[in-house]
């Protein structure tokens, strides 16, 4: 079938809006009509060429919501007309990782997903006879996309897709990092580095967890008002201080914060986030994705004196079994999604969404088909 799509043909070049061919879903696969998709920093990261797994030409997009229009052989968990969110972190329930109960990092489709193809090793997308790569198992920048059954969360059909599409990545990652990875407790102190979609979601999650002090850090003060609406108690611009930001936070709090979160993907900021953690028990969670070949560093003394350094993917959330509940929470107003959507636009304007992101003028732009 034909589908409108925004295709990244080359590194660093604007996406091209073209009509691609989408092959039918094969065994264990589902054809989904995407209704809305967010434009995430991870899409921009891959487009920039810094992503070590980046492949071109590719149909990007991984933060979407849509409706099932066709199912392949053997699919039982969803049917025609179901409302779904594609998942870049699958949940098969059968692999070693799923059965461990210790992680959400299912490996059922990981090997092929990282190669930009479906589980059988081939692509469902083509343009003028040329095969196009899939992206993170989702490819929501195409109006019609094919997704593995194990990579689909079935959601309440009454949910607003313009909002809940953000649960496909950023908001879930941030809130999940607070509850699942850091396990923030009432009264704990929190520092959040980077106030994009994920950082603001961490702030919101920390407020849900009843954290005592929530310190929001960004070099763009225009983001502070929304951070305070989300629950931040303090907002800091590192440019306003001569000292390293970790020293500023340690002096503000006495010994540092109970939990810090790096939501940017900058290895120097990752170090700052660790070193502002409380001596003896502070922990720092890396959420941001750094560029290819970059490494983190700190003095071992920082860890010997009780700090913990950890990371998280999709906030530790199991997509098929837990994401539907987060959709319900959003419908009850327990998770705020509307404030994240600063711009909405048609697919033809998708490159504007990247410009707004790079200029720091948006939290999330949502594309509607």
UniProtKB/Swiss-Prot annotation:
<keyword id="KW-0560">Oxidoreductase</keyword>
<dbReference type="GO" id="GO:0046294">
    <property type="term" value="P:formaldehyde catabolic process"/>
</dbReference>
<dbReference type="InterPro" id="IPR002328">
    <property type="entry name" value="ADH_Zn_CS"/>
</dbReference>
<comment type="function">
    <text>Has high formaldehyde dehydrogenase activity in the presence of glutathione and catalyzes the oxidation of normal alcohols in a reaction that is not GSH-dependent. In addition, hemithiolacetals other than those formed from GSH, including omega-thiol fatty acids, also are substrates. Also acts as a S-nitroso-glutathione reductase by catalyzing the NADH-dependent reduction of S-nitrosoglutathione.</text>
</comment>
<dbReference type="InterPro" id="IPR014183">
    <property type="entry name" value="ADH_3"/>
</dbReference>
<dbReference type="Pfam" id="PF00107">
    <property type="entry name" value="ADH_zinc_N"/>
</dbReference>
<dbReference type="GO" id="GO:0106322">
    <property type="term" value="F:S-(hydroxymethyl)glutathione dehydrogenase (NAD+) activity"/>
</dbReference>
<dbReference type="GO" id="GO:0004022">
    <property type="term" value="F:alcohol dehydrogenase (NAD+) activity"/>
</dbReference>
<feature type="binding site">
    <location>
        <position position="92"/>
    </location>
    <ligand>
        <name>Zn(2+) 2</name>
    </ligand>
</feature>
<keyword id="KW-0479">Metal-binding</keyword>
<feature type="binding site">
    <location>
        <position position="106"/>
    </location>
    <ligand>
        <name>Zn(2+) 2</name>
    </ligand>
</feature>
<dbReference type="InterPro" id="IPR020843">
    <property type="entry name" value="PKS_ER"/>
</dbReference>
<keyword id="KW-0963">Cytoplasm</keyword>
<dbReference type="InterPro" id="IPR036291">
    <property type="entry name" value="NAD(P)-bd_dom_sf"/>
</dbReference>
<comment type="subunit">
    <text>Homodimer.</text>
</comment>
<dbReference type="GO" id="GO:0106321">
    <property type="term" value="F:S-(hydroxymethyl)glutathione dehydrogenase (NADP+) activity"/>
</dbReference>
<dbReference type="InterPro" id="IPR013149">
    <property type="entry name" value="ADH-like_C"/>
</dbReference>
<dbReference type="GO" id="GO:0008270">
    <property type="term" value="F:zinc ion binding"/>
</dbReference>
<dbReference type="InterPro" id="IPR011032">
    <property type="entry name" value="GroES-like_sf"/>
</dbReference>
<dbReference type="GO" id="GO:0080007">
    <property type="term" value="F:S-nitrosoglutathione reductase (NADH) activity"/>
</dbReference>
<dbReference type="GO" id="GO:0005829">
    <property type="term" value="C:cytosol"/>
</dbReference>
<feature type="binding site">
    <location>
        <position position="62"/>
    </location>
    <ligand>
        <name>Zn(2+) 1</name>
    </ligand>
</feature>
<feature type="binding site">
    <location>
        <position position="95"/>
    </location>
    <ligand>
        <name>Zn(2+) 2</name>
    </ligand>
</feature>
<feature type="binding site">
    <location>
        <position position="169"/>
    </location>
    <ligand>
        <name>Zn(2+) 1</name>
    </ligand>
</feature>
<dbReference type="GO" id="GO:0051903">
    <property type="term" value="F:S-(hydroxymethyl)glutathione dehydrogenase [NAD(P)+] activity"/>
</dbReference>
<feature type="binding site">
    <location>
        <position position="98"/>
    </location>
    <ligand>
        <name>Zn(2+) 2</name>
    </ligand>
</feature>
<keyword id="KW-0862">Zinc</keyword>
<keyword id="KW-0520">NAD</keyword>
<dbReference type="InterPro" id="IPR013154">
    <property type="entry name" value="ADH-like_N"/>
</dbReference>
<protein>
    <recommendedName>
        <fullName>S-(hydroxymethyl)glutathione dehydrogenase</fullName>
        <ecNumber>1.1.1.284</ecNumber>
        <ecNumber>1.1.1.1</ecNumber>
        <ecNumber>1.1.1.-</ecNumber>
    </recommendedName>
</protein>
<comment type="similarity">
    <text>Belongs to the zinc-containing alcohol dehydrogenase family. Class-III subfamily.</text>
</comment>
<feature type="binding site">
    <location>
        <position position="40"/>
    </location>
    <ligand>
        <name>Zn(2+) 1</name>
    </ligand>
</feature>
<dbReference type="Pfam" id="PF08240">
    <property type="entry name" value="ADH_N"/>
</dbReference>
